[in-house]
From Swiss-Prot:
The modification Phosphothreonine is found at residue 137. Keywords: Acetylation, Cytoplasm, Membrane, Mitochondrion, Mitochondrion outer membrane, Phosphoprotein. The modification N-acetylmethionine is found at residue 1. Interacts with mitochondrial contact site and cristae organizing system (MICOS) complex components IMMT/MIC60 and MICOS10/MIC10. Interacts with mitochondrial outer membrane sorting assembly machinery (SAM) complex components SAMM50 and MTX1. ARM repeats lie at residues 39-81. One of its GO terms (cellular component) is mitochondrion. In association with mitochondrial contact site and cristae organizing system (MICOS) complex components and mitochondrial outer membrane sorting assembly machinery (SAM) complex components may regulate mitochondrial dynamics playing a role in determining mitochondrial length, distribution and motility. It is found in: Cytoplasm; Mitochondrion; Mitochondrion outer membrane. One of its GO terms (molecular function) is metal ion binding. Disulfide bonds: none annotated. This is Armadillo repeat-containing protein 1. Its main location: cytoplasm. It comes from the Eukaryota.
Length: 282
C-alpha cells in the first residue's frame, strides 16, 4: 500500500531533477510550459528549502530563467510559498552571499511585476541594499560583458562554453542567446574580459569577440588579442544575475535545444512533476 516510499534509488535524485528543470528553463521556448505545469513550480519552491546548497542554487537559477518571461511573473509571485521561500533564502545566515543576491533579484522582479514605476524602483533599491548588507565586504561591484562567440551554434558547443566559463574565478553568472551566438556574462569588476576570451578559446572550437556600443549607439565587434591570459580557477559554481545591459533582445529569436521536441519536453515535465509530488519530505 505504501508504494510512494518505495525504491527511491530507481528514481532521479533531487539534484538531477532540479538540474534538468534548470536546463529546460534556460530555453525560452520552455518557460511558459514549466510555469503552467501543476507540479514543477511548486517543486522549485520546495527545492529552495533543500538542505543541499547546490540544489538551492540550481533551483534559483531555474526560477531566474522563468522570471525572464514577463507573462510568468504574476503566476510565479502568486504561487504558494514563493515569496516567503525567497525571503528565507535571503535571511538565512548560512546562505552564501551571492546566493542571497540572486534570491533578492528574483524577489525584486516578482515583487515589482504589478507595482507602479516609482514604487517598483524604491522597492528594488531597498532589496538590493539589504542583499548587499548581507554580502558584507566580500561584495565587489559586478560588470556585464557581452560576447559574440563564433562557433556557438548547438547544444554541445554551449555545454563546452559553460564548462569553460564555470572554471573562471570571478564569473558570477552567464546566459546564452543562441539565435545570435551571444553570451551575456556578469563578472567581478576586477576580472578582465580577456580572461573570458582565453577560456572560450581553450575549447579549440570557439572564439569570442566583445560586443560594444559606439557613441552613436551602433553595435561593434571588438576582437581580443590572441595572447592567452592566465585564468584563476574557480572552485564554486556562480550565481545568476540579470542581463539588463544586453544590447539584443532574445524574445522571438530564440531557438530550441538541438534534438528537443515540444512533446518530449512536456513528457519530461510530467515525469519531473510526478517525482516532485512524491519526494519532497526531508
Amino acid at each position: 500500500m505504501n508504494s510512494s516510499t518505495s525504491t527511491m534509488s530507481e528514481e532521479p535524485d533531487a539534484l538531477s531533477v532540479v538540474n534538468q528543470l534548470r536546463d529546460l528553463a534556460a530555453d525560452p521556448l520552455n518557460r511558459r510550459a514549466i510555469v503552467q505545469d501543476q507540479g514543477c513550480l511548486p517543486g522549485l519552491i520546495l527545492f529552495m528549502d533543500h538542505p543541499n546548497p547546490p540544489v538551492v542554487h540550481s533551483a534559483l537559477l531555474a526560477l531566474r530563467y522563468l522570471a525572464e518571461c514577463r507573462a510568468n511573473r504574476e503566476k510565479m509571485k502568486g504561487e504558494l510559498g514563493m515569496m516567503l521561500s525567497l525571503q528565507n533564502v535571503i535571511q538565512k545566515t548560512t546562505t552564501p552571499g551571492e546566493t542571497k543576491l540572486l534570491a533578492s533579484e528574483i524577489y525584486d522582479i516578482l515583487q515589482s511585476s504589478n507595482m507602479a514605476d516609482g514604487d517598483s524602483f524604491n522597492e528594488m533599491n531597498s532589496r538590493r541594499r539589504k542583499a548587499q548588507f548581507f554580502l558584507g565586504t566580500t561584495n565587489k561591484r559586478a560588470k556585464t560583458v557581452v560576447l559574440h562567440i563564433d562557433g556557438l551554434d548547438d547544444t554541445s558547443r554551449r555545454n563546452l562554453c559553460e564548462e569553460a566559463l564555470l572554471k573562471i574565478k570571478g564569473v558570477i553568472s552567464f546566459t546564452f542567446q543562441m539565435a545570435v551566438q551571444r553570451c551575456v556574462v556578469r563578472i567581478r569588476s576586477d576580472l578582465k574580459a580577456e580572461a573570458l576570451a582565453s577560456a572560450i578559446a581553450s575549447t579549440k572550437v570557439m572564439k569570442a569577440q566583445q560586443v560594444v556600443k559606439s557613441e552613436s549607439g551602433e553595435e561593434m565587434l571588438v576582437p581580443f588579442q590572441d595572447t592567452p591570459v592566465e585564468v584563476e580557477q574557480n572552485t564554486e559554481l556562480p550565481d545568476y544575475l540579470p542581463e539588463d545591459e544586453s544590447p539584443t533582445k532574445e524574445q522571438d529569436k530564440a531557438v530550441s535545444r538541438v534534438g528537443s521536441h515540444p512533446e518530449g519536453g512536456a513528457s519530461w515535465l510530467s515525469t519531473a512533476a510526478n517525482f516532485l509530488s512524491r519526494s519532497f519530505y526531508w
